[in-house]
């Protein structure tokens, strides 16, 4: 998600966008007299009557924001199609194999480093992911609550087809332009070490240092950049991120990748997955979507070298909380946190494991289920992460084995009356060996940018995006999707944004009855394309915002359709679906 505007009330928070929405809707109603009936009549079709006003408001909102966008000028980030160059792209393995090479073994290297400079107060840094009213919408970094890391694994299947690198950053998102810049720094190294791909993900924490530029010193930079764009003076626009910090950021990730490759050890890979139930996940702001991925998916790499540290790779679909959010009357909301992901890693580290993390399809799906006493906002994600970490360690254990292990069975927090012991009724799952087969394919995709808010944001140059111009005001964002096969049965889709779970596994919002536009989604789900056990790695090699079904897309600015304001546009999901169909051909 590009941004979330939040304020707190007592010990909770609500979206400040409600206030903004009320103001916008007041303006809309002034301009919309007589327009709603006409629009509703034209587009009603199978739409429910209750949805007609929302659809009409969405049309009006797009029109009004579109008028603002029309007044803004393109900058050097907008490149005509004939001049467009997409460099530093890796295609993956040249060929796919179905059998492991004779005598082949997995090889994995791991590294993890902090992305927080020791002298962080000397930089111009802000928390990426929310703006707080009590902090004048500028959450400058003043303290470090835990850490912000990049975790890296280098993985090779022994087939001679090269090593794939995967890096996950504790941040709101890393834009494709920055990712390709990091790849560029590693071009020679990649050739020398036969790297077939370099893939960079984000955990999507909302309390990390802003690595995109949207959550900057908005009172200073936003007005200046907007005015400069309107006056066609793009050279006067200010970068959203701190340039010196970004150089530090690039260098740390580059070094971590090199360290992971250098530390590769041969060993065995196993896989286990367990459904932990809906208690630990909840749909916060996309009620039309009904699918929920409630599984923990764990890869465990055990090196042959007994002195080397094993590595756990975890995939789960839970949007991080806002660990650094201002709470109460004290001066806070300025703390960097890796959110629940950091505390999963802390727990696995105590048990003797390295940790790697991939988020899943997280559009609207937040953490929940753990109830412990909290003094600060960060305590909630910490409690959640530590408990999830213990579950990850226990996938193949019985309830009796867990109870006998004090580390696993003892809570790391003071439980409230509502707390339910996580291992009650726990049953183990079977762990299977993963044959050393790693196929990976990446593909460039052009997404048409129909959302005027995103077009305008690109023009004010706060985010590092390269926009392809195919015609007059015909804008596209070129990014990547990916497909991975591990062993003979595990299939993974790499998605460059916050993916609606219905689009992965099927759900009500794909149907005419369950969608706001009253028609079926015309694309295929990931299950349709790859099979029912497909795994999603989200925010992969880009952070393009929300990806929601075309038939459930309307920019009405209300709570149920908040995601549309931060989506590239109405055809993003169908474009993605078609691209995934192509990638498996």
Annotate the PLM regions.
Residues 392:
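Glycan-recognition surfaces in beta-rich domains, encompassing non-catalytic CBMs
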Residues 31-43:
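Sec-dependent signal peptide cleavage junction
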Residues 1-15:
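Short, Lys/Arg-enriched N-terminal segments with co-localized hydrophobic residues
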Residues 16-24:
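Bacterial N-terminal signal peptides that target proteins for export
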Residues 30-31, 216:
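Hydrophobic alpha-helical membrane context
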Residues 42-201, 205-383, 396, 406-585:
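Conserved beta-alpha junction segments in alpha/beta enzyme cores
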Residues 25-29:
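Hydrophobic alpha-helical targeting segments used for export or membrane insertion
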